[in-house]
Amino acid sequence: MKIRLYASLLALLLVFPAACAFAQTAVTANPNHQQLLQGSDARTTANKRLVYDFWRIVFEAGHTEYAPMYMAEDYIQHNPTVANGRDAFLQFLTAFVKPQPIKPRVQLPLVAILAEGDYVTLVSVRTLPDPKDATKTYTTTWFDMFRIQNDKIQEHWDAATK
């Protein structure tokens, strides 16, 4: 009897961690954008604000007339679906974002805004369809990283694929 109990407990202990390995804690946004915009010094704070306002005004609201305030003309793009250069980015953007009122906050569900030196990374929630069940979704993270040079966005990376 004891052997069977120990065998059952051992089997449970072996199966339970494996099942937990496939469990996921949902990724959630941080609602406090003012906290996210705080930097360790004046430079990182300014760089965070530059990227945040670019995202809010140009990317989300589609106000491309403000792009020269935020983006270098020779902007470098590492997303494989968008060409280099500010003009190429704007051509890409205007194909799917039409100008709309500028909101006071970024609408992207931000998890974090990280800044180190000339680099700023937006970390956000990404909700995707569950490949095993089309009626469900799951959350994961997405990132957009920017390099700032001369107070403008000079370069961008993300996880996009072709």
Question: Which residues does each PLM region occupy?
Answer:
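A short, structured loop/turn motif at beta-sheet edges
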Residues: 113-120, 147-153
